[in-house]
Amino acid sequence: MTEAQRHQILLEMLAQLGFVTVEKVVERLGISPATARRDINKLDESGKLKKVRNGAEAITQQRPRWTPMNLHQAQNHDEKVRIAKAASQLVNPGESVVINCGSTAFLLGREMCGKPVQIITNYLPLANYLIDQEHDSVIIMGGQYNKSQSITLSPQGSENSLYAGHWMFTSGKGLTAEGLYKTDMLTAMAEQKMLSVVGKLVVLVDSSKIGERAGMLFSRADQIDMLITGKNANPEILQQLEAQGVSILRV
């Protein structure tokens, strides 16, 4: 039975009963409790049911709600999926990773969910997803909630060394031979504090961002350990980055 078929049957159960438990879904569909909870989570995120403790409730009207689960709507979605998959393969069991905000970041977090790695993030949609999926080790960086970016930002001068990771994965609005550019200054400044305490900095940007310069310079090219991007990225820019010691992976 496919996921789509399971979802259809689950919604039909709710239409008849109004409420179903995880145990009832397991019994009806012949699936594991983890799969049942995952199906309920996905249908909740898409507004087709309401997730409640130990089950789900029917809703009379679907909620028009955008969440990171609607990533198929993101620009260059397929390329970002490939980038996220490639990035996840860099991390070894037992390591810790810092993942920042954005659609590619969420895709990466989804790829790593369930693996024996510690995920450090200030991106609340990703943190909520990891908690819902019962990922073993999640650290949420503290600070003031920034509604526009759905992240937490720590006060100026606060100590971030507690959040040092083996890897830091980040993206931006543009990448040139000079380095990575970000447009949100507060977010960029908060992330910059961590550059000196992470093991390796990996930039994840789709090919449309290569050669673009927008906002503030977040990190110089010589601070970047690796770039993962699409196959259509500007080859001239990639050569200039390689000359400065940046490892390039095109997917």
Swiss-Prot record:
GO terms for cellular component: cytoplasm. Residues 3-58 form the HTH deoR-type domain. Keywords: Cytoplasm, DNA-binding, Repressor, Transcription, Transcription regulation. It comes from the Bacteria. Pfam families: DeoRC, HTH_DeoR. One of its GO terms (molecular function) is L-ascorbic acid binding. The keyword Transcription applies. GO terms for biological process: DNA-templated transcription; negative regulation of DNA-templated transcription; regulation of DNA-templated transcription. It is found in: Cytoplasm. Residues 20-39 bind DNA. Disruption phenotype: Cells lacking this gene show a more rapid utilization of L-ascorbate and are able to grow on L-ascorbate under microaerophilic conditions. Its main location: cytoplasm. PROSITE patterns: HTH_DEOR_1 (PS00894), HTH_DEOR_2 (PS51000). SUPFAM superfamilies: NagB/RpiA/CoA transferase-like (SSF100950), Winged helix' DNA-binding domain (SSF46785). Gene3D superfamilies: Winged helix-like DNA-binding domain superfamily/Winged helix DNA-binding domain. NCBIfam families: PRK13509.1. Represses ulaG and the ulaABCDEF operon. Two ulaR binding sites have been identified in each promoter. Full activity requires simultaneous interaction of UlaR with both divergent promoters and seems to be dependent on repressor-mediated DNA loop formation, which is helped by the action of integration host factor. HAMAP family: HTH_type_UlaR. This is HTH-type transcriptional regulator UlaR. It comes from Escherichia coli (strain K12). The lineage of its organism: Bacteria, Pseudomonadati, Pseudomonadota, Gammaproteobacteria, Enterobacterales. The gene is ulaR.
